[in-house]
């Protein structure tokens, strides 16, 4: 019942990257959250909001939970961006096509901004990244976050030489 007012999880796929954008579960809704993660094959969850559930049940199911909280409605701090991109580079080089779940409270601000950054770092224009995400997650990304993405200058940290690079584990840095 708690999920009725929340948007359903959405998958965003681009090149060899897959993301699951979702809202935060509670301990009461954790079992359905874990089912969603398994359905999409997500083995890593990035939590960018305050803790609302015990991560032990996820870890018991082999799902890694990473905590990088930052303020609601705000763009991510530089350290979160660096850690996020580093995690993705390792994850998608080692296991192309795998899925990384990311959530904030409603799945409309902080989580979509991180996914947009990944798309931009992989070569997509910021306008296209925002449109791509908003097609699947209506209402995502507020004006402050939009300005941040517009001014963001990618270093192409997620440009992959070859979508089949997993054979050589070779990524462009």
UniProtKB/Swiss-Prot annotation:
Subcellular location per the Swiss-Prot or TrEMBL entry: Cell membrane; Early endosome
Name of the protein in its database record: Protein tyrosine phosphatase type IVA 3
SUPFAM superfamilies reported in the protein's UniProt record: (Phosphotyrosine protein) phosphatases II
One GO term (biological process): positive regulation of non-canonical NF-kappaB signal transduction
Family: Belongs to the protein-tyrosine phosphatase family.
Record PTM Cysteine methyl ester, positions in chain: 170
One matching Pfam family: Tc-R-P
Keyword line: Cell membrane, Disulfide bond, Endosome, Hydrolase, Lipoprotein, Membrane, Methylation, Prenylation, Protein phosphatase, Proto-oncogene
GO terms of molecular function: protein tyrosine phosphatase activity
Pro-sequence residue ranges: 171-173
S-S bonds: 49-104
Lipidation (S-farnesyl cysteine): 170
Native species: Bos taurus
GO cellular component: cytoplasm; early endosome; nucleus; plasma membrane
Active-site positions on this chain: 72 (proton donor), 104 (phosphocysteine intermediate)
